[in-house]
Amino acid sequence: MQGRLNRRVLVIEDDNDIRRLITESLRAAGLDVVAAVDASQALRTALARKPAAVVLDIGLPDQDGTQFVARWRERRPDANEVPIVVVSGRADRREIASLLGAAYVCGKPFIVDELVDQVERAVLN
């Protein structure tokens, strides 16, 4: 018997308004969303239960998104299988996303429907 599809998405975003927008939009699309405001909270959450996908802001208050990914993958090798959707306003976001092996990249500002579509594709692949 096949298990239920993991639809849990970890959203890591320090801006309250953006985090709320992403979280509510993904929930409206039927995804199970958990949010973190910084890398420390995100690491605890990701280690407790592996998400199906991660929506990651690169610029976080306690450490940058690349440091979060490195620590997570170091402590949980199967994290390499989890697709990452980078959401960032940084000019170098595509280069950083490439280094992380991210599945998708969204700039800020972003079109909500496009972000939701990318996250849904990441979860299903």
Set out the residue ranges of the language-model regions.
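Conserved acidic carboxylate
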Residues: E13, S88
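The feature encodes the CheY-like receiver
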Residues: P61
